[in-house]
């Protein structure tokens, strides 16, 4: 509730309920009313990326969940203002955008597939959190940073948050089909879109 108020999104209630049915599927319904901060023609979805676009992220990746269950995933600040500023700064050069909740390996694949392409990530470019290698950066999840595709280089910072180009979108191939995420480390390239957080499997 407090987080919602901080972003002018109060939890109104009225449709919050539980039921005692135990032998059927769990059903969760979330109703959201919102007014876009940008004109309707500039709503940025995840399906606008095209081969040749740069892939970039805000902040640092990996290490969001600590061994005791605590960590950055419990007190992150949504990148709402950064997303709006990014759209205003890049204009039509901002092609697609989403948040990173299941890890870059999973989410880059979703963004690439939505635009009928593949994603190639440069391991050496990843902005990793302290104590994390590139593998943790692409698989840990719960980063809640922005992942976006753009035609031109993005600004180096947004409201004090670093922005890093980590790769680019490419056309699918026989080796790397639509939705594949490929990470390059030195001269090596491997698919990683099978990694990351899978809901209902616990990992």
Locate each region found by the language model.
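A generic structural signal for well-ordered alpha-helical segments
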Residues: 4, 90, 112, 158-159
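Glycine-rich anion-binding loops of enzyme active sites
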Residues: 1-65, 168
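Short, conserved charged micro-motifs
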Residues: 38-43, 152-160
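Short, ordered loop/turn segments at secondary-structure junctions
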Residues: 15-17, 60-61, 100-103, 124-126, ...
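Active-site-proximal betaalpha loop/short-helix elements
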Residues: 73-142, 172-173, 182
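Acidic, Ser/Thr/Pro-rich beta/coil linker or hinge segments at domain junctions
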Residues: 18-19, 158-203
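Short hydrophobic/aromatic beta-strand micro-patches
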Residues: 33-35, 147-151
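Active-site glycine-rich loop that binds ribose-phosphate moieties when present
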Residues: 30-47, 71-89
């Amino acid at each position: 509730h407090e987080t919602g108020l901080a972003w002018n999104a109060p939890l109104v209630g009225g449709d919050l309920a539980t039921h005692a049915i135990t032998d059927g599927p769990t059903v969760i319904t979330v109703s959201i009313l919102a007014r876009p901060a940008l004109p309707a023609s500039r709503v940025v979805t995840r399906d606008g990326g095209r081969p040749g676009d740069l892939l970039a992220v805000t902040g640092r990746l990996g290490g969001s969940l600590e061994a005791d269950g605590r960590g950055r995933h419990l007190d992150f600040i949504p990148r709402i203002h950064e997303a709006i500023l990014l759209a205003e700064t890049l204009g039509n050069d901002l092609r697609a955008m989403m948040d990173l909740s299941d890890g870059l390996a999973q989410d880059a694949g979703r963004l690439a597939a939505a635009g009928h392409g593949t994603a190639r990530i440069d391991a050496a470019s990843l902005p990793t959190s302290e104590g994390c290698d590139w593998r943790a950066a692409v698989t840990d999840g719960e980063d809640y940073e922005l992942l976006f595709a753009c035609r031109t280089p993005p600004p180096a910072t947004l409201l004090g948050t670093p922005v890093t180009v980590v790769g680019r979108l490419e056309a699918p191939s026989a080796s790397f089909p639509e939705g594949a995420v490929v990470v390059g480390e030195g001269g090596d390239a491997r698919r990683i879109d099978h990694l990351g957080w899978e809901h209902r499997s616990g990992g």
